[in-house]
């Protein structure tokens, strides 16, 4: 079988792919790039040239508090969808009626409004498209190319340099709608559309 139709899993994890990201700019919705910068990250828009450093989270997150009331020591628990930089929740004790703001633990989510986001700013990924109830996505163009090679291969092999446990590898965790041979042509067409995406 020709190498064109074979794919040997290089042992890549999703974490290995999280080196940079292509996202929608929070200012103009154009294409923006998130790259490592001075031991942190920087987002730069290719359309409006907006530049931003980490600080604001644009995606979904949950604020969660589980504490004992400061007055009567009754257990208090609350969880709400949060936005921006929330870090406190106002709570009223059902037992003694005391009201107070408590420090909340913030849990950031990788999905916002049904679409995937980057793990740095929570911005919607540029390279994604809904497929039925699912979403096909990639962090950046190199990630998209690897997915294209995998989808296009008729023979998919576990590579010899495979360094991780089988279930931690990116290709072993792909959803069925991507891995199913019957969806190959549809997926390749979708990947080509994403490669050509301008707006």
Regions found by a protein language model. Give the residues of each.
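N-terminal cysteine/histidine-rich coordination modules
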Residues: 1-81
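A composition-biased, non-transmembrane "mature-region" signal
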Residues: 8-16, 60, 79-88, 95-98, ...
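Core catalytic machinery and nucleic-acid-binding channels of phosphodiester-processing enzymes
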Residues: 21-23, 90, 154
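Cysteine-rich micro-motifs
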Residues: 38-52, 70, 86-99, 117-119
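Conserved small-residue-rich
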Residues: 67-94, 98, 135-143
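Amphipathic alpha-helical packing elements
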Residues: 118-162, 169-178
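C-terminal, charged low-complexity interaction regions
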Residues: 165-199
């Amino acid at each position: 079988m020709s190498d064109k139709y074979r794919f040997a899993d290089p042992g890549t994890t999703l974490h290995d792919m999280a080196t940079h990201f292509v996202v929608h700019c929070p200012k103009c919705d154009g294409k923006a790039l998130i790259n490592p910068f001075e031991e942190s990250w920087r987002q730069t828009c290719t359309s409006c040239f907006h530049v931003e450093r980490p600080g604001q989270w644009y995606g979904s997150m949950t604020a969660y508090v589980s504490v004992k009331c400061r007055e009567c020591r009754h257990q208090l628990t609350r969880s709400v969808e949060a936005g921006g930089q929330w870090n406190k929740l106002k709570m009223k004790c059902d037992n003694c009626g005391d009201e107070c703001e408590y420090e909340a633990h913030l849990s950031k989510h990788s999905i916002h409004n049904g679409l995937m986001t980057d793990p740095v700013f929570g911005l919607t990924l540029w390279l994604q498209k809904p497929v039925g109830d699912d979403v096909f996505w990639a962090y950046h163009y190199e990630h998209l190319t690897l997915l294209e090679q995998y989808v296009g291969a008729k023979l998919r092999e576990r590579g010899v340099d495979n360094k991780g446990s089988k279930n931690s590898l990116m290709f072993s965790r792909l959803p069925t709608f991507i891995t199913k041979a019957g969806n190959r042509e549809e997926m390749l067409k979708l990947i080509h559309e994403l490669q050509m995406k301008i707006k």
